[in-house]
């Protein structure tokens, strides 16, 4: 079975960021409704993420993705219509999207494998803020995701349900120059295939974060968390419970009206519990230089929402719970660009190079190692272009290249692969 990378119901660019996906909407009182539907047809060179010597199976793919969001009218729109409007007592946003996937094998020998892959992925989310933009406020959120993710053996898959639910309290005295939040989040991951059911787990995360603004376009930031991860179904499957701890301190501010810098650094420790537990205990960090292409328009550091036209260059280092071994450490170097040309053509480009390090991997009973520590660089590059024929209809192209650059073999599984995807689509949105 293959250790594929995470997939989600949000492969489409317009689902990942509402700035790209939503149109004018339907206004009813203090609420906005944004329905939409997209259809795509394209090519996938290696859906099963197989190594070059394991018969990569190319295919044609079709995706149909309806979506709908409902939210209260934003503060900026309220102020634009009636001056300095009083913040609402409650604001919320709910969203639901689903993707139906169909496959056509390009090699007749792969027809049976692909006939079993048609599936539906979906995501739903809810965010609720109580007494927003006041000295004391609260937030509640929940989301549920069904991920469709193949292994390199077509008879098995990593399809799973992931849910989160959390709440927090925020204190913001003095007109919002200072704010501090404490929160709790519960997470549950459930694998549908019985071959991977033992990987199901639950997490509890207690977090806090603070911000102090000064100068007045700069802020000192702090965040910290303590987590508890448990594998309940089979403690002998080789996966270890853990209590990860993270703490970071940093700065976010404008260098000029069009250029901002985020820099955060701290320490993280994994605290895995069990025989031959492999631990991460070291630096975690993030740095990002962002260019606001349209000066002073919607810059969130100037008091508005993030605009569509931005570019960013960044680096992030963190450790993550892993289903292959105990954890992996990712050093991600990334570049992003999004720009709306003349209100008609949207271009979004994302690229990343991520050396990913794994510690020594042990077999299920944790007594014998199955592979020494190794690093497998990961490459991801996505380009999305959409021409909007009107305020509600667009034609788009999505291309994506991804690769795991390694020849490491773990338990007879070659972890190296590369994949190219290209889709032509149409989208209606309000």
Predicted feature residues:
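Sec/Tat signal peptide C-region and signal peptidase I cleavage site
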Residues: 3-9
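Gram-negative and organellar
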Residues: 9-430
């Amino acid at each position: 079975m293959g250790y594929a990378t995470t997939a989600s119901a949000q492969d489409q660019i317009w689902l990942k960021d509402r700035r790209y996906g939503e149109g004018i909407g339907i206004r009813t009182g203090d609420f906005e409704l944004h329905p939409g539907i997209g259809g795509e047809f394209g090519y996938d060179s290696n859906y099963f993420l197989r190594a070059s010597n394991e018969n990569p199976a190319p295919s044609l793919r079709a995706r149909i993705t309806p979506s709908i969001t409902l939210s209260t009218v934003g503060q900026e729109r309220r102020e634009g219509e009636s001056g300095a409007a009083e913040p609402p007592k409650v604001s919320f946003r709910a969203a639901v999207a689903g993707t139906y996937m169909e496959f056509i094998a390009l090699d007749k020998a792969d027809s049976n494998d692909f006939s079993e892959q048609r599936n539906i992925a979906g995501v739903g989310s809810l965010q609720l803020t109580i007494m927003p933009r006041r000295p004391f406020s609260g937030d509640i959120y929940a989301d549920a995701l069904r991920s469709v993710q193949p292994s390199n053996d077509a008879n098995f898959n990593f399809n799973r349900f992931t849910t989160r639910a959390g709440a927090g309290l925020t204190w913001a005295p003095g007109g919002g120059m200072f704010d501090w939040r404490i929160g709790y989040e519960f997470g549950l991951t459930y694998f549908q295939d019985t071959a991977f059911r033992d990987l199901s787990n639950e997490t509890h995360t207690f977090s806090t974060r603070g911000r102090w603004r000064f100068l007045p376009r700069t802020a000192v930031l702090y965040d910290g968390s303590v987590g508890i991860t448990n594998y309940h179904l089979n403690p002998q499957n080789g996966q270890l419970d853990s209590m990860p701890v993270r703490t970071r301190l940093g700065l976010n501010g404008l260098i000029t009206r069009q250029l901002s810098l985020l820099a955060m650094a701290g320490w993280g420790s994994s605290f895995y519990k069990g025989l031959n537990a492999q631990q991460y205990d070291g630096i975690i960090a993030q740095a990002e230089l962002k260019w606001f292409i349209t000066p002073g328009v919607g810059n969130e550091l100037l008091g508005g929402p993030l605009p569509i036209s931005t570019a960013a260059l960044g680096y992030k280092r963190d450790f993550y719970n892993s289903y292959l071994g105990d954890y992996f450490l990712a050093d991600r170097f990334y570049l992003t660009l999004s720009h709306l040309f003349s209100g008609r053509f949207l271009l979004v480009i994302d690229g990343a190079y991520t050396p990913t390090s794994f510690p020594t991997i042990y077999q299920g009973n944790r007594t014998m190692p199955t592979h020494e520590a190794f690093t497998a660089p990961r490459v991801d590059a996505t380009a999305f272009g959409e021409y909007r024929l009107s305020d509600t209809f667009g034609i788009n192209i999505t291309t994506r290249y991804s690769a795991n650059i390694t020849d490491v073999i773990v338990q007879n599984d070659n972890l190296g692969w590369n994949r190219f995807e290209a889709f032509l689509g149409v989208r209606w949105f309000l």
